[in-house]
């Protein structure tokens, strides 16, 4: 038997594909899903298969996080390819089987160095790690007024000179580029990439994020080809009953895929639920905006921090060193802040992985089917990868997560190989 003929039978689990399938058996052949069905498992038919008993467990597609700045102690902007392997593995063991590594505003030299590292990993999958689908360029072409924690020094209007340099450095692996469409030639930039996305740019997606656009400017950008919103609500104009902005354009235009950070800190759950109510589960993708802290146990990060009781937060010395910055980084309520307690305090990013985000959304009253859809199939569709990933169906990549009743991952499979396995066979 060759490795490509290897068979694995996952039997007796409650399957959400992401739609509920009841108790089903899933047969894996090589790196693909061979079949899924509710009929009794016939051991004689798959005598050569490795049998995994998923009774009393839940089986879902591998989660897809499209906004990941780091994890496992590594930050996309400041790490080489070797260090970013830790990020891929930290997310994988938590059931996140595909990630888009996100790069913040910085010098072109630093951005291109990061894009090269991500491009290498996109073309050379990490053993035991989440599949890196490509990179997400965020903040470089954003608004100075809505920069959030982006480095103000390096923000500039969208331009083709920088973009083509980034595209070359990435080896054609940039999946998403976020812009403030109101800046200079934002519309022309968007139209060009949207027009030639499939032909010349491997289906790159143009998003609006860190934007101070008016409603009319945002609508014009959507008409020009923007199809995605970078972490909706955070770093964007709007949320006013008279002076409408980007947020209202996202709500009222069905073609926009709206990312939403689901740590409960970046966005109040009431607004997150309102967004989902308006756009539906097929229009909203769950993301984390995770930093280097994601996937690290409290015991580990607490060793690199100092508790400050006045702020009820932990100051992270190692994050400060990792980022090469004179800013102070704090963990508070599962989010990372800069300069907490000062006038310029800002949210820096998240420290959860998407599996924790999934549990949050379920705790907000959504069914598991709804939450899983927003963490799997919806993001896969937004990247035009739903023919490969995002659901449990014959012919698709065998990216699966087996959960216990509390939605903790007991086993994780990426393209037919277990990267975590705590179940009996």
Give the residues covered by each predicted segment.
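His/Asp/Glu-enriched, well-ordered alpha-helical/loop segment
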Residues: 248-258, 277-288, 294-402
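Divalent metal-coordination and catalytic microenvironments
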Residues: 13, 26, 31, 56, ...
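C-terminal cap of metal-dependent C-N hydrolases
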Residues: 13, 376, 381, 391-425
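Metal-associated gating/positioning segment near the N- to mid-region
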Residues: 54-114, 245
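Active-site core of metal-dependent hydrolases
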Residues: 168-298
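Divalent-metal coordination cores built from histidine and acidic residues
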Residues: 88-173
């Amino acid at each position: 038997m060759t490795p490509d003929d290897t068979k694995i039978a996952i039997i007796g689990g409650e399957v959400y594909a992401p739609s509920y399938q009841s108790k089903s058996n899933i047969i894996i052949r090589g790196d693909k899903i061979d079949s899924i069905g509710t009929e009794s498992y016939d051991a004689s038919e798959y005598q050569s298969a490795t049998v995994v008993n998923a009774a009393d467990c839940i089986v879902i597609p591998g989660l897809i996080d499209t906004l990941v700045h780091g994890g496992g102690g590594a930050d996309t902007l400041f790490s080489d390819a070797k260090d970013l392997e830790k990020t891929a593995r930290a997310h994988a063991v938590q059931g996140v089987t595909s990630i888009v590594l996100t790069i913040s505003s910085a010098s072109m030299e630093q951005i291109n160095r990061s894009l090269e590292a991500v491009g290498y990993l996109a073309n050379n999958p990490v053993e035991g790690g989440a599949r890196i689908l490509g990179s997400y360029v965020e903040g470089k072409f954003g608004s100075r007024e809505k920069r959030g924690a982006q480095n103000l020094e390096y923000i500039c209007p969208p331009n083709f000179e920088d973009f083509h340099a980034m595209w070359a450095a990435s080896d054609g692996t940039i999946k998403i580029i976020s812009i403030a469409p109101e800046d200079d030639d934002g519309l022309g930039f968007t139209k060009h990439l949207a027009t030639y996305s499939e032909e010349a740019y491997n289906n790159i997606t143009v998003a609006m994020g860190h934007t101070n656009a008016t409603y009319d400017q945002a609508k014009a950008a959507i008409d020009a080809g923007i199809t995605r919103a970078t972490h909706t609500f955070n770093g964007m104009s709007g949320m006013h009953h008279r002076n409408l902005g980007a947020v209202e354009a996202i709500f009222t235009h069905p073609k926009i895929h709206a990312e939403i950070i689901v740590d409960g800190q970046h966005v109040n759950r009431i607004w997150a639920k309102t967004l989902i109510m308006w756009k539906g589960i097929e229009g909203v993708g769950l993301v984390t905006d995770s930093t280097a802290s994601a996937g690290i146990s409290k015991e580990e990060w607490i060793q690199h921090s100092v508790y400050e009781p006045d702020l009820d937060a932990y100051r992270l010395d190692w994050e400060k060193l990792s980022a090469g910055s004179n800013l102070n980084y704090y963990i508070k309520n599962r989010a990372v802040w800069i300069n907490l307690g000062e006038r310029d305090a800002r949210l820096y990013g998240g420290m959860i992985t998407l599996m924790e985000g999934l549990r949050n959304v379920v705790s907000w009253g959504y069914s598991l089917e709804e939450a899983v859809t927003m963490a799997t199939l919806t993001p896969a569709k937004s990247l035009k990868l739903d023919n490969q990933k995002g659901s449990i169906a014959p012919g698709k990549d065998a990216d699966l997560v087996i959960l216990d009743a509390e939605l903790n991952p007991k086993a994780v499979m990426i393209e037919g190989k277990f990267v975590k396995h705590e179940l009996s066979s």
